[in-house]
Amino acid sequence: MATKKEEIEVKVANDDTRIEKVDQVLPPIALLEKFPASQEAADLVHETRLHAHNIIHGKDDRLLVVIGPCSIHDPKAALDYAKRLKVLRDKYKDTLEVVMRVYFEKPRTTVGWKGLINDPYLNDTYRLNDGLRIARKLLSDINNLGVPSAGEFLDMITPQYVADFMSWGAIGARTTESQVHRELASGLSCAVGFKNGTNGGVKVALDAMGAAEASHYFLSVTKFGHSAIVSTKGNEDCHIILRGGDKGPNYKAEDVAKVCAEIEKSGRIPHVMVDFSHANSSKQFKKQMEVCEDVCQQIAGGSKQIFGVMVESHIVEGRQDLVDGKAQTYGQSITDACIGWEDTEIVLKQLSDAVVARRQVNG
């Protein structure tokens, strides 16, 4: 009988010629049992997913707000942020459905730090097992605070470790056109937003929605880590996220109206989520405030074409580089620059006020 080491070292002719090594990863069940979702967390996820569904389908006039750090690199700071956000989530619960952005994986145009799961110690040691443990524990802690979480899905396996804690999910601009990500979205238990392409076009996102609404079969793993064929039911809670593109932003009223006309042609409710960051802010974090003002004017004017927003926010504004031997600034992003906490409070108040104004306009 082969030992575990021998099983890992099985060689096949002409295979793995560029693979340096293969390390086993913990099966999902190991972490699900170590960090099970509490009843409170499970109830929160269920309720928030239902609220997101109702907002997306026009049954709830509140605004879905996905807000938080560009990426998570310091669990302590992330939990600190979540505690602060909980206060504002409760304060604006009648106008906003606030969900914390808890992103552990970062898609890259070329290379760079790929996120807490991939490299949790920020030192190129790639301790994935530790990354998965840290991520699941943090999601448990955040949800236990009463703050629902949102994440971006980059592969077909990681969701088996963390998806039960996710109340909303995103497929990024670089992966919206990917068939496997559309298939994945069709089987996720939460609402999923598809970003428009990096070129600014929305056709790929519309196509992605259509694909994700259908049923699919694809390869993944079971909770016990065995390779398996997954059969999905299709996801009716998919939508478009406008994030701007190479040609500039697409959050203005005329841009939103143009996209909504395309959505309406497809037989869906003509509304979108607007990403305040990325190409909509020209990657200048402070411009998120300008985007917010414009979007709030649209909402306050009575527009129902914007049902949700996405904001990159942290405790300390801006961003920092990882420098060997230099202490990190607590609560500041190491990926995209974010607005700070003071501006976060302003943004959420403005969004809440805009929803109140929209209700008055529309009766």
Model regions: which residues?
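N-terminal intrinsically disordered, cationic/polar leader segments
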Residues: 86-87
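Internal helix-turn-beta structural module
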Residues: 314-359
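Active-site-facing alpha/beta catalytic cores
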Residues: 2, 9-16, 82, 95-251, ...
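A contiguous, surface-oriented mixed alpha/beta subdomain in the mid-to-C-terminal portion of proteins
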Residues: 243-245, 250, 258-273
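Conserved, mostly hydrophobic/aromatic
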Residues: 68, 274, 340
